[in-house]
Amino acid sequence: MLDIQLLRSNTAAVAERLARRGYDFDTARFDALEERRKSVQVKTEELQASRNSISKQIGALKGQGKHEEAQAAMDQVAQIKTDLEQAAADLEAVQKELDAWLLSIPNLPHEDVPFGKDETENVEVRKVGTPREFDFEIKDHVDLGEPLGLDFEGGAKLSGARFTVMRGQIARLHRALAQFMLDTHTLQHGYTEHYTPYIVDDTTLQGTGQLPKFAEDLFHVTRGGDETKTTQYLIPTAEVTLTNTVADSIIPSEQLPLKLTAHSPCFRSEAGSYGKDTRGLIRQHQFDKVEMVQIVHPEKSYEALEEMVGHAENILKALELPYRVITLCTGDMGFGATKTYDLEVWVPAQNTYREISSCSNCEDFQARRMKARFKDENGKNRLVHTLNGSGLAVGRTLVAVLENHQNADGSINIPAALQPYMGGVAKLEVK
């Protein structure tokens, strides 16, 4: 959530920055809400002053034997109490409307984020690796994976479209990828591994920005009977749980940065994605991902963003996968991000690069929602900056390994870095 004081002091400038990302901030509505708030506050202060003044007179009037005047003053105080209660209710209503609105306003883009309306205007930063030239007719990951244990029909039978069953060799490869990613992040990059819940409350999702704006993208579950029924949600990413581990806390500055990672399933309804990527693993309702989160000092967050991108790149390099890094333009960034890099891996059968990681700096946007703070060197409580990134999406990495390392006979070469996680197996072969 944006800083309300920044909005109040620089309304026009904030509106201009939001317009760069395609958000129309209604300054007239904001000004009207502010006028209502100020009016109620002034009225409240006046009522309180009158109450205090009249209350002081009551004792004196009684002491002078002026009982009727004292009673009249007491009646005035009683009426003022009623008026103050109404003013408090009015102020609460204004504040609720303002708070609800603030929760729907996206973060401000960083000054160096390229301006653009959509993904077509993202900017390529670098390409790493050269796509392989095949001397045979290549297959996509569906045709390669099905003989190795990738079962789309089985997934659809159990749960409907966009669900998959994996068995045998392909299931082992999927597990090996996740373990390799976790080990790389914990042993080489300094992250602490976490295991977190897959079901969370709405306040948790509000903290990281998925609610209230993106409710339709989430799967929810109900718990309890009619009288105690509560709604909870399946996590769309472990970013939600990892980041919220610091909610409502004050972290000693010497403990920063916190570097957290977790392997989890992710659940997304893919609202608005009808007809997109209907074949294969690219877009699923349930998929695994290894997530990276950093909680850092505000002055270190952009340095941390570059570091996090490097951590994701190290996985792709180790798996010998060609990829590119792009900076998302203002019109393509996520709701809570100030700056985002996407890593896109080469997918031979599609003859293009596809997103496999997204690394974002949210600055204090999430921290303000979560009340996540640190105590600085002067003993002052300040909001931390939060960052998140995929390290990587396991299913899409599986797609990339299958397609980039395929052989003419349908076998798959296992990258050397992954072989220890496959029990020394160097090649997957159809049996």
From Swiss-Prot:
Keywords: Aminoacyl-tRNA synthetase, ATP-binding, Cytoplasm, Ligase, Nucleotide-binding, Protein biosynthesis. InterPro entries: aa-tRNA-synt_IIb, aa-tRNA-synth_II, aa-tRNA-synth_II/BPL/LPL, Ser-tRNA-ligase_type_1, Ser-tRNA-synth_1_N, SerRS_1_N_sf, SerRS_core, tRNA-bd_arm. GO terms for biological process: selenocysteine biosynthetic process; seryl-tRNA aminoacylation. This is Serine--tRNA ligase. Its main location: cytoplasm. Pfam families: Seryl_tRNA_N, tRNA-synt_2b. GO terms for cellular component: cytoplasm. Homodimer. The tRNA molecule binds across the dimer. SUPFAM superfamilies: Class II aaRS and biotin synthetases (SSF55681), tRNA-binding arm (SSF46589). PROSITE patterns: AA_TRNA_LIGASE_II (PS50862). It is an enzyme of class 6 (ligase). ATP binds at R268, S269, E270, E355, I356, S357, S358. Consists of two distinct domains, a catalytic core and a N-terminal extension that is involved in tRNA binding. It is found in: Cytoplasm. Belongs to the class-II aminoacyl-tRNA synthetase family. Type-1 seryl-tRNA synthetase subfamily. Gene3D superfamilies: Bira Bifunctional Protein, Domain 2, Serine-tRNA synthetase, tRNA binding domain. Pathway: Aminoacyl-tRNA biosynthesis; selenocysteinyl-tRNA(Sec) biosynthesis; L-seryl-tRNA(Sec) from L-serine and tRNA(Sec): step 1/1. It comes from Neisseria meningitidis serogroup C / serotype 2a (strain ATCC 700532 / DSM 15464 / FAM18). The keyword Disulfide bond does not apply. The gene is serS. Signal peptide: none annotated. GO terms for molecular function: ATP binding; serine-tRNA ligase activity. Its EC number is 6.1.1.11. It catalyses: tRNA(Ser) + L-serine + ATP = L-seryl-tRNA(Ser) + AMP + diphosphate + H(+); tRNA(Sec) + L-serine + ATP = L-seryl-tRNA(Sec) + AMP + diphosphate + H(+). Catalyzes the attachment of serine to tRNA(Ser). Is also able to aminoacylate tRNA(Sec) with serine, to form the misacylated tRNA L-seryl-tRNA(Sec), which will be further converted into selenocysteinyl-tRNA(Sec). L-serine binds at T237, A238, E239, E291, S390.
